[in-house]
């Protein structure tokens, strides 16, 4: 599994643990829902800044998203 796949799996898991939709995560992170969807489908290649924004929204460390 490559790093983008790990990000997608971990992001989706953490989002669902919080009971959030993609729209809710997008709102919290200041991103578009379609961008969140693209990351989870491994069709988008997010920047480090975007990964950090997602981690802050999910209240986790960046490393938790990439492990």
Describe each model-derived feature in a short phrase.
Residues 1-6:
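A detector for short, charged/polar N-terminal pre-domain segments
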Residues 11, 25-26, 36-39, 65:
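Conserved hydrophobic/aromatic packing and binding residues within compact polymer-binding modules
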Residues 49-64:
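DNA major-groove recognition helix of helix-turn-helix/homeodomain DNA-binding modules
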Residues 23, 34, 46, 52:
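Residues within helix-turn-helix
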Residues 30-45:
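Recognition helix of helix-turn-helix/homeodomain-like DNA-binding domains
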Residues 9-28:
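Short basic helix-loop element that most often maps to the first helix and adjoining turn
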Residues 13, 17, 45, 57-60:
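Conserved amphipathic alpha-helical interaction elements at protein-protein interfaces in regulatory
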